[in-house]
């Protein structure tokens, strides 16, 4: 494999990974797997929105719940905006709604991480197949 082809493949895999992080399912859409992309988008967005619905925007807490926030950030960089809005303390959440909301939003982020890894792996396999042909 020539260096130029290898560099192009790395850049393509990076683009797939970043797009999959910015928009859940976006990496699969770039790989022309429309059905997978739609399923991933609907699943992750609904899981995240259920967590926000149960616990309000206050479950995204970059100050008091950093481990949960890291998992939530795997959904999309848009979570950083929500974290900024909720860091003022204007959206207090306590007890079960807080816990359930954090769990749902964090699980959505971790699920998106699996989908990002899968999209990058599929891009890698596609690059290997094109260089062998």
Language-model segments: what does each one mean?
Residues 5-35:
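Long, hydrophobic N-terminal alpha-helical segment
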């Amino acid at each position: 494999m020539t260096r130029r082809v290898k560099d192009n493949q790395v850049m393509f895999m990076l683009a797939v990974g970043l797009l999959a992080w910015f928009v859940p399912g976006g990496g699969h859409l770039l790989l022309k797997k429309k059905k997978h992309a739609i399923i991933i988008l609907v699943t992750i967005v609904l899981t995240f929105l259920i967590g926000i619905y149960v616990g309000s925007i206050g479950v995204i807490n970059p100050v008091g719940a950093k481990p949960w926030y890291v998992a939530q950030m795997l959904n999309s960089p848009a979570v950083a905006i929500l974290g900024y809005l909720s860091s003022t303390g204007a959206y207090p959440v306590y007890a079960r709604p807080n816990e359930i909301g954090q769990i749902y939003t964090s699980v959505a982020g971790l699920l998106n991480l699996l989908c990002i890894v899968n999209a990058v792996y599929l891009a890698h396999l596609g690059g290997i197949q094109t260089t062998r042909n």
